UniProtKB/Swiss-Prot annotation:
Membrane-crossing segments per the record: 167-187
GO cellular component assignments: lysosomal membrane; lysosome; organelle membrane
Post-translational modification: Ubiquitinated. Autoubiquitinated in vitro, leading to its degradation by the proteasome.
Organism: Homo sapiens (Human)
EC number, UniProt record: 2.3.2.27
Its biological purpose: E3 ubiquitin-protein ligase that acts as a negative regulator of mTORC1 signaling by mediating ubiquitination of RagA/RRAGA and RHEB. Catalyzes 'Lys-63'-linked polyubiquitination of RagA/RRAGA in response to amino acid starvation, thereby regulating mTORC1 signaling. Also mediates monoubiquitination of RHEB, promoting its association with the TSC-TBC complex and subsequent inhibition. Also mediates 'Lys-48'-linked polyubiquitination of target proteins and their subsequent targeting to the proteasome for degradation. Induces apoptosis when overexpressed.
Family in the record: Belongs to the RNF152 family.
Primary enzyme class: transferase
UniProt-annotated location(s): Lysosome membrane
Pathway this chain belongs to: Protein modification; protein ubiquitination
Protein name: E3 ubiquitin-protein ligase RNF152
Membrane topology: Single-pass membrane protein
Length: 203
């Protein structure tokens, strides 16, 4: 298999959608990877799943679905890294008996415990009462590593964000100093031009 960049590891090379709990990275017998949605669409038109790159056949026993193919562990290791986000997704159960994943801010003042009732604003200025539902770690989709590793990765990510913010501030200050210096040179030259007919030279 050819070497892929990390960005291409994050997306299905057929539909170019990012892998997610709905679009799981499935490993074919030929060791190529594509999302479960694309494989399901291929399976509806064919009896077996044929790799779009090498044409290798991945046979599924009768009654088996694409979801029972193994996930690609290399891709899962890449996409399990938390991405920069100000909110942590929390599963909530709405009164309409649907289950949604909404980003709820985590703060001590506004935190909801499992089973607590609360009210959250949804798009379109709608208010819905919600009940927080916790999902055991072993049932959460696409979670990799132990909770301690996740905490360490989050701390590393925050360190990178703080570092990049600080370097951005330093860059702005440096550019401002250079501009002030150049403005001083221009003003000095302008004052010398206005005095060129005097005996005093600007040096």
């Amino acid at each position: 298999m050819e070497t892929l960049s990390q960005d291409s590891l994050l997306e299905c090379q057929i539909c170019f959608n990012y892998y997610s709990p709905r679009r799981r990275p499935k490993l074919l017998d030929c060791k190529h990877t594509c999302c479960s949605v694309c494989l399901q669409q291929m399976r509806t038109s064919q009896k077996d799943v044929r790799c779009p790159w090498c044409r290798g056949v991945t046979k599924l026993p009768p009654g088996f679905s694409v979801s029972q193919l193994p996930d690609d562990p290399e891709v899962l290791a890449v996409i399990a890294i938390p991405h920069t986000s100000e909110h942590t997704p929390v599963f909530i159960k709405l009164p309409s008996n649907g289950c949604y994943m909404l980003p709820l801010p985590i703060s001590k003042e506004r935190a909801l415990l499992p089973g607590d009732m609360g009210c959250r604003l949804l798009p379109g200025s709608q208010q819905k009462s919600v009940t927080v539902v916790t999902i055991p770690a072993e049932q959460q989709p696409l979670q990799g590593g132990a909770p301690q590793e996740a905490v360490e990765e989050e701390q590393d990510r925050r360190g990178v964000v703080k570092s990049s913010t600080w370097s951005g501030v330093c860059t702005v200050i440096l550019v401002a100093c250079v501009l002030v210096f150049l403005l001083g040179i221009v003003l000095h030259n302008m004052s010398c031009i206005s005095k060129r007919f005097t005996v005093i030279s600007c040096g």
